[in-house]
């Protein structure tokens, strides 16, 4: 038996920082380079490896992604449905739920998906991708994907980590394209959030999206009975 003396002072702080860093980097917050959380990146990478032009069962995609994502099938399935509902990177088939009504998607064995043409053209390039070993060392996965489009702004994101949170509102696809062209030409541009579900927004205190900025969104909520609230506009 080996007995070792250790200093307790500072140990909990180091443990907390290690855990916080792991949650931030591996679970909750997207990478600014491609706008994707690790589970989203691994889903897209798996779908690219499976790509043959045909739809795949979501259950099959989830199982394939588990080669790279060690946190269970439920988190993968939920993330895949959220990606599909944004109607940008994934071509969906079947009942994928409805973001307007809040209806959930059908079970993974009943719905299918494949990468959209936009994703195939914009997201992947093996020659410029930096790779790392997967969690068990059996496969390689991308550190980030070489996305040629500001996905972080297009999709928006909400993530809560240990001691850190991120919330970026979604933006309009066409406005992002126009802003990207102006940026490349070194021209001035204004860019504000947009919502798929519609509604009115006050951006007078947006602060160009920097910390401390705020937006005000009008919502119409009706009380039907003691158990039901209907959101008519947001």
Language model regions located:
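Catalytic phosphate-handling regions of large nucleic-acid enzymes and associated NTPases
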Residues: 4-212
